[in-house]
Amino acid sequence: MTDDVPLAAERLHDQLAATAQLPVDRRARRLLGEAEAVAEDMRACEDAVVVERAAVVRDLLAEVEATGDGRADAHLARARALAEDLARPEHR
């Protein structure tokens, strides 16, 4: 793995984990929880696997319209940007 990929994967996980303690609506909570689990798993993966799993996280986060909490929405926006960046094929 290149140095930037593991760091970005860690930051992605941290952004999603930060939503766990916030008052988020039920549907968003389920999707954020799934995305967090995938992000947690991908932290120890090879670059090609990170790209694939980041795409899964990106797709899960795309289904979240709003969280019902402004702080969680900010974490969601940062997580979306990180997942989008990590899902780019040049990270393979």
Regions found by a protein language model. Name each.
Residues 1-92:
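Acidic, polar-rich N-terminal leader regions of halophilic archaeal proteins
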